[in-house]
Amino acid sequence: MSHFSTIKTKLKNKPILQEALELLQYDVKQDQELKVTGAHGIGHETVEAELAIGTDIGFRLNEITGVYELVADLETWNQPIPVERLLDKVNQQYARMTIHNTVKKMGFQVEEEWEMDDNSIELTVTRWT
């Protein structure tokens, strides 16, 4: 029978997580009930997700740790990329958005940005005084 699996992340900021998902071309829906159906349509399981990117994939806040978790039905995963790659892409975009927001708050402006062969990101920032 299908069921939801929970994968821990280090993502804490909901607006940045939502922006990262949208930049990755996901249609993000807020406060959705995710649902999986058992074999042959018998039984089902539901879980609440603060940010959903499908009917059975989303992110929910762990109230104890204050960190978002990926919840998904890994048994019937039918995305174009493996779940590990999805998390890598989300983490990279989340980090990019966090850096952009931080440098902006510090009065800097991103002038150039490169994605390196190893998937790291390099930025050139400036600040006029």
Feature map (PLM): residue ranges:
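Interaction-mediating elements
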Residues: 1-129
